[in-house]
């Protein structure tokens, strides 16, 4: 019985070693797009493993960009999420592909657009050529979206952009204060507007000390003190306690 147990244990150890070696072999190989896509669909490689693979070979970034255009959701969103992670840690590696991320803003998939908004904001930290400045209007045009998540994403990422490009703070502030005039739609209710206002106050708080239009901002925040949304009221109160 003891020998049987030892043999079974040895089998599972061997099986685990085989699986580990198989994964290592997958990660060590040079992908083409079809192999990358299939690996994500079949889950023979995790997103974390693939991320580490790309970190060791940034030449794989074009494959991820191709993957974002895939008709398969697992590939599309898997590659898109990896690009966000890379933009946070290695914006300089993605910066040469800035134009590709601008194109993704017009994706028919909202999640891809949201991810592109995040990536572009992260790339402003290394935007020596002021490529973002050229698309400022396009980026902030998404504040006019019919969808709350799209508007909220622009508001949230505006803080990253403002800190990376402080000379744009006056323009960014002007854009953020326009959320008061966001239109109600099927996908953006009055309560959604309150959520957006709450996020706007948080974002403005990241760089309020650098804002010239302080009284306009304070007026916007004070108007939120009577909101029926508790979290918005408390956010406004905390802002005014610090800055008002």
Residue ranges and their predicted role:
Residues 161, 179-235:
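Extended alpha-helical scaffolding segments
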């Amino acid at each position: 019985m003891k020998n049987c147990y030892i043999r079974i244990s040895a089998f599972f150890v061997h099986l685990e070693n085989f699986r580990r070696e198989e994964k290592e072999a997958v990660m060590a190989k040079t992908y083409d797009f079809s192999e990358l896509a299939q690996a994500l669909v079949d889950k023979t490689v995790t997103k974390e493993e693939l991320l580490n693979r790309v970190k060791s070979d940034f030449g794989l970034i074009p494959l991820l960009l191709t993957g974002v255009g895939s008709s398969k959701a697992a590939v599309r969103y898997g590659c898109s999420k990896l690009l966000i992670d890379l933009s946070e840690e290695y914006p300089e590696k993605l910066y040469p592909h800035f134009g590709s991320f601008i194109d993704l803003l017009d994706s028919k998939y909202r999640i891809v657009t949201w991810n592109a908004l995040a990536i572009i904001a992260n790339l402003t930290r290394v935007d020596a050529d002021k490529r973002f400045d050229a698309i400022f209007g396009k980026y902030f045009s998404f504040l006019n979206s019919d969808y709350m998540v799209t508007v909220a994403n622009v508001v949230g990422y505006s803080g990253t952009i403002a800190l990376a490009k402080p000379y744009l703070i006056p323009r960014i502030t002007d854009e953020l204060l326009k959320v008061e005039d966001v239109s109600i739609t099927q996908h953006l209710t009055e309560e959604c507007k309150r959520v957006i206002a709450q996020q706007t106050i948080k974002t403005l708080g990241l760089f309020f000390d650098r804002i010239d239009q302080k009284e306009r901002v304070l007026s916007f925040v004070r108007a939120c003190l009577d909101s029926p949304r508790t979290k918005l009221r408390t956010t406004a109160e905390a802002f005014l306690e610090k800055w008002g």
